[in-house]
Amino acid sequence: MARPLLPLNALRAFEAAARHLNFSRAADELSVTPGAVSQQIRLLEDIVGGPLFVREARGLQLTDLGRSSVPLLREGFERLMDASALLREPPRRKQVSISVAPGFASKWLMPR
């Protein structure tokens, strides 16, 4: 049985917050409010059953769970960006050039 995916927005918020160790900077990067980032992190923490950050007066620190998952998330997002770039590329047309005598081209090749 397939395991359900975690919410992508929550994972994006977590990865950005982990990189910046700051909800406000993560929010700026994602063009959302710091409250929205905090809400997504709380949702993710509820789903995984434990804290991803230790919230301190001087900032955020990753828990062991948070620290161990960040490299995998970064790799996953890099792969998604690569796949997105590949899908956005216009398809390359394969072009074949042939050279034939003009009489052969007009009487035999072009009618086909």
Which residues are covered by each model-predicted region?
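Short helix-boundary/capping micro-motifs
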Residues: 16-31
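Short helix/strand-capping hinge loops at secondary-structure junctions
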Residues: 20-22, 48, 56, 111
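A short LG(V/I)-centered, amphipathic sequence patch enriched
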Residues: 45-62
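Alpha-helical linker/hinge and terminal dimerization helices associated
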Residues: 47-48, 69-90
